[in-house]
């Protein structure tokens, strides 16, 4: 594998982790959004990754295959005075797991940093290669 391919692979990982961070930020921002444009509570999103290898290659980068809605049920919070409460006094809240989203945020951030380090290492190797003949 050529060193230049590493830039493509690490770059794809940076883009994928950036998308993961954006989705986690959106989930956290909407953790208390009781209603959305459709009148329903916000539904947490999840990023699905897949390998992005060139045909015939065993290795490759990563790409975002899709962003899907979490199938976890909405949380029910007892607030009988809330105008959005049902007949039993429960309000449907988003299915966002705040702790899980914080873990996703930290994991994506660490992965992003690791791929930056890969890029810096390859850059350093290429610069050292250029100075070998001196």
Swiss-Prot record:
Keywords: Bacterial flagellum. Transmembrane segments: none annotated. One of its GO terms (cellular component) is bacterial-type flagellum. GO terms for biological process: bacterial-type flagellum-dependent swarming motility. The keyword DNA repair does not apply. The keyword rRNA processing does not apply. Its main location: other. PANTHER family: FLAGELLAR BASAL-BODY ROD PROTEIN FLGC (PTHR30435:SF2), FLAGELLAR PROTEIN (PTHR30435). The basal body constitutes a major portion of the flagellar organelle and consists of four rings (L,P,S, and M) mounted on a central rod. The rod consists of about 26 subunits of FlgG in the distal portion, and FlgB, FlgC and FlgF are thought to build up the proximal portion of the rod with about 6 subunits each. This is Flagellar basal-body rod protein FlgC.
